[in-house]
C-alpha cells in the first residue's frame, strides 16, 4: 500500500513524502521539493535504549551514473543522532560477475530459512554491520544456527550464568529475591532470564538489576526488570543517562508493554554497594578502566565469583603474555575493593580462574 500527498518534518524542514508498506514495515520517503530526489527514508522503529525512534537513511550529493543518479553520501540517523556516515568513493555500474560465485549450494538452499515475518530486527542487524559484527539471525540475542537457546549454567549453589547468546548475565539467588548482573540485548532476553530464574528458584522478584555499564548491548533489556519493580544499580555519573532512557516513550517495544518508569529507584555507585539478605552478600564495585566511564564489576562473596563485562571476557581466549590496560583494571579493582575472587564470569565468553590474571598483573 502506498500513500502520497503527505508532509513530514525532519531537522526543522518540511518535506513532501510518500509512505508505503512492505514486509510488515512502513517506509516514509521524503523528497526534495525542487529536485524531486529522495532525501530521507524513515522507519518508525524501537531502540532498546531510546525507545520509540525515527530511524533514517539520509541521502545527499546525488551524482549521475550510467543514466541514473546515485547518492554518494548515505548517513544513518537515530532520532537525529548519526550512527553511521557512509561515502561512496568508487562505483562501477553493471560490473562483470562470475555467475558461479553467485550460485547458492544445493545443501544450503535446502536448509535455508523462510523469509522472516512479523517483528524483524533489521535495525539491530544493520547497526551490527556498521561495527563489523554481522549476526545472520532473526533472533537478535543469538544465532539460531549456532546455538539452540539461552541457558542457565550453574557456577555455584544459587549462582547462575546466563549463556548461549552473544551477551551474558549472572543471576544470584537470595532468600526472598534475586539479583541480576547486566540486562543485555533486549527485553525478550531479560524476560527469558526472569522466567528461567524463577523456574529454578521459585517466584522471587528481581530486587536489584546491576548494570556494569551503559552500552546498549549490555543494558538494552533493562525495562523488563524495571517493570518488576527492581532497583537499578549503576556506576558513578550514570543516573541522568538512565533517567533519560527510562523517560523515553516505548510504545513500539515488541517484547513488553509501555510503563511509567518515572519513579524507578536508581542507586549510583561511586565506590561499593552491598546487597544482602542477612546471609548471602552480593556487591557492585566502581572500576576505573579504559573502556567506559562508570564501570562496575560484580561479586558474590560466599561463592567468591566475580562478574565482569568487556574489559575481560573470561574463557574467551588465553591470557596474553603481557598484561593489557583493560585486564590490569580488573585486578586493580579487585585489590581496591578488597575482594578475593576465585573465578570471574563474563558478560562475554564464559568463566575463568582469577589467579592467573592476578599473577600476570603482578609479574609486570
Regions found by a protein language model. Give the residues of each.
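Short, small-residue-biased leader/transition segments that mark boundaries at the very start
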Residues: 2-3
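Gly/Pro-enriched, hydrophobic low-complexity segments
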Residues: 11-109, 299-301, 308-309, 314, ...
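Zn-dependent metallo-beta-lactamase
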Residues: 86-175, 273
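Conserved beta-strand hairpin/beta-sheet module of binuclear metal-dependent hydrolase folds
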Residues: 152-199, 295-314
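Active-site metal-binding loops of divalent metal-dependent hydrolases
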Residues: 183-185, 214, 230, 237-238, ...
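Active-site metal-binding motif and surrounding structural segment of the metallo-beta-lactamase
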Residues: 188-233, 336-341
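Metallo-beta-lactamase
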Residues: 237-287
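Divalent-metal (often Zn2+) His-rich catalytic cores of metallo-beta-lactamase-fold enzymes
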Residues: 330-364
Amino acid at each position: 500500500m502506498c500513500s502520497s500527498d503527505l508532509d513530514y518534518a525532519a531537522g526543522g524542514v518540511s518535506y513532501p513524502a510518500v509512505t508505503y508498506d512492505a514486509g510488515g514495515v512502513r517506509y516514509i520517503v521524503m523528497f526534495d521539493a525542487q529536485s524531486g530526489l529522495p532525501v530521507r527514508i524513515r522507519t518508525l522503529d524501537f531502540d532498546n535504549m531510546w525507545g520509540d525512534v525515527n530511524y533514517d537513511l539520509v541521502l545527499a550529493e546525488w551524482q549521475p551514473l550510467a543514466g541514473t543518479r546515485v547518492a554518494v553520501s548515505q548517513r544513518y540517523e537515530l532520532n537525529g543522532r548519526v550512527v553511521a556516515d557512509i561515502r561512496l568513493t568508487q562505483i562501477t555500474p553493471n560490473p562483470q560477475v562470475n555467475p558461479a560465485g553467485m550460485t547458492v549450494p544445493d545443501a544450503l538452499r535446502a536448509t535455508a530459512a523462510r523469509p522472516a515475518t512479523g517483528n524483524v530486527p533489521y535495525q539491530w542487524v544493520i547497526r551490527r554491520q556498521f561495527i563489523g559484527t554481522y549476526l545472520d539471525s532473526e533472533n537478535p540475542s543469538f544465532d539460531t544456527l549456532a546455538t539452540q537457546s539461552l541457558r542457565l549454567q550453574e557456577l555455584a549453589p544459587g549462582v547462575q550464568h546466563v549463556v548461549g547468546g552473544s551477551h551474558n548475565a549472572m543471576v544470584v539467588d537470595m532468600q526472598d529475591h534475586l539479583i541480576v548482573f547486566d540486562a543485555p540485548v533486549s527485553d525478550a532476553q531479560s524476560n527469558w532470564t526472569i522466567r528461567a530464574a524463577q523456574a529454578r528458584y521459585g517466584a522471587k522478584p528481581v530486587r536489584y538489576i546491576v548494570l556494569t555499564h551503559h552500552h546498549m548491548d549490555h543494558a538494552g533489556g533493562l525495562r523488563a526488570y524495571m517493570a518488576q519493580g527492581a532497583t537499578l544499580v549503576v556506576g558513578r555519573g550514570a543516573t541522568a543517562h538512565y533517567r533519560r532512557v527510562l523517560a523515553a516513550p516505548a510504545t513500539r517495544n515488541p517484547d513488553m508493554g509501555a510503563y511509567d518508569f518515572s519513579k524507578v529507584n536508581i542507586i549510583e555507585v561511586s565506590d561499593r554497594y552491598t546487597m544482602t539478605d542477612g546471609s548471602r552478600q552480593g556487591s557492585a564495585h566502581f572500576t576505573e578502566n579504559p573502556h567506559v566511564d562508570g564501570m562496575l564489576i560484580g561479586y558474590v562473596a560466599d561463592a567468591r565469583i566475580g562478574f565482569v563485562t568487556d574489559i575481560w571476557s573470561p574463557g574467551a581466549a588465553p591470557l596474553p603474555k603481557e598484561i593489557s590496560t583493560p585486564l590490569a583494571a580488573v585486578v586493580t579493582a579487585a585489590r581496591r575493593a578488597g575482594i578475593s575472587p576465585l573465578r570471574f564470569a563474563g558478560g562475554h565468553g564464559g568463566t575463568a580462574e582469577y589467579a592467573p590474571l592476578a599473577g600476570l598483573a603482578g609479574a609486570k
